[in-house]
């Protein structure tokens, strides 16, 4: 049996060209492409990470094609011979989301898969907490026809973010990682929900409570022992208990080597201890609102 395919221009049949290929040759070629792709899929670089998607608050949904340029290049070259026999599978889709907003803010992320060829939508998550880092894992349960994928009618990822922060500000960053496989076999699977794996936050204790770093910071930025032949005595760092709604306080005790100097009329923030009348730090009557208005936004 032979398949004859003809390409004709819109002006008529005079510029047409045709070729013939046997069914056995077509199947052999399809098998070779499928095997070659399977070997590359089983190799160390089986997953694709194309770019990072910055999700902005209230912006238009971000749309990303989940068929790599390499696969589209193969399809465009081989489509005249094997296009009707090949499919694109998405057997692994991972979506790594990292928030850019604080836990005190609120927001939601909507993620969907869109099959442009059929017009069907699959929900990944329609109300994910925008402040929570996580990894989504799943797959698409149907095959995409190679001829559709070559035309750009492939599987799309659609993402939208809404948050309580400023409009068009970065809510978070999404890293899509997927596997797109060429095969002459068509898959038929029962659809399953995407899995979501939360990512725990790290603790800053190691760096923040590093006595050496903080001591060096104080010594480098305060006038200690000027004109003295002896080194100043080291200070001791004492972490205070955390109060609800307040940051943990690091108390640096005063001593003869820590003079109460002022810089431009403002006391240096060597010690922040509101409970002590002798404590240095923020001047009396200081408010963050006035600081922002006078120092950060003086022209507003």
Curated annotation (Swiss-Prot):
Cellular component GO terms, alphabetical: host cell plasmodesma
Keywords: Host cell junction, Transport, Viral movement protein
Cell compartments where the protein resides: Host cell junction, Host plasmodesma
Family: Belongs to the alfamovirus movement protein family.
Record protein name field: Movement protein
A single BP term in Gene Ontology: transport of virus in host, cell to cell
InterPro entries linked: Bromo_MP (IPR002538)
One matching Pfam family: Bromo_MP
Organism placement in taxonomy: Viruses, Riboviria, Orthornavirae, Kitrinoviricota, Alsuviricetes
Function: Transports viral genome to neighboring plant cells directly through plasmosdesmata, without any budding. The movement protein allows efficient cell to cell propagation, by bypassing the host cell wall barrier. Acts by forming a tubular structure at the host plasmodesmata, enlarging it enough to allow free passage of virion capsids.
């Amino acid at each position: 049996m032979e398949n004859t395919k003809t390409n004709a221009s819109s002006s008529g049949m005079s510029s047409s060209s045709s070729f013939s290929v046997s069914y056995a040759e077509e199947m052999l070629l399809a098998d070779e492409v499928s095997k070659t792709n399977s070997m590359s899929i089983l190799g160390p670089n089986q997953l694709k990470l194309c770019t990072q998607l910055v999700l902005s608050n209230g912006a238009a949904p971000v749309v990303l094609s989940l068929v790599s340029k390499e696969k589209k290049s193969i399809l465009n070259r081989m489509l005249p011979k094997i296009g009707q026999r090949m499919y694109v599978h998405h057997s692994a889709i991972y979506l790594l989301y990292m928030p850019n907003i604080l836990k005190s803010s609120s927001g939601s992320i909507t993620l969907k898969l869109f099959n442009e060829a059929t017009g069907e939508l699959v929900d990944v998550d329609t109300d994910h907490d925008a402040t929570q880092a996580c990894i989504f894992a799943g797959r698409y349960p149907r095959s995409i026809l190679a001829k559709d994928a070559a035309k750009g009618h492939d599987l799309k990822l659609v993402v939208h973010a809404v948050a309580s922060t400023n409009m068009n500000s970065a809510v978070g960053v999404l890293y899509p990682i997927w596997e797109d496989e060429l095969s002459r076999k068509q898959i038929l699977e029962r659809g399953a929900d995407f899995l979501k794996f939360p990512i725990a936050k790290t603790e800053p204790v190691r760096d923040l409570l590093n006595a050496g770093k903080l001591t060096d910071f104080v010594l480098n930025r305060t006038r200690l022992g000027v004109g003295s032949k002896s080194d100043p005595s080291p200070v001791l760092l004492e972490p205070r208990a955390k109060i609800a709604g307040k940051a943990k306080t690091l108390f640096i005790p005063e001593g003869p080597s820590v003079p109460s100097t002022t810089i431009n009329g403002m006391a240096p923030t060597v010690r922040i201890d509101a409970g002590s009348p002798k404590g240095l730090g923020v001047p009396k009557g200081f408010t963050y609102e006035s600081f922002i208005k006078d120092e950060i936004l003086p022209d507003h």
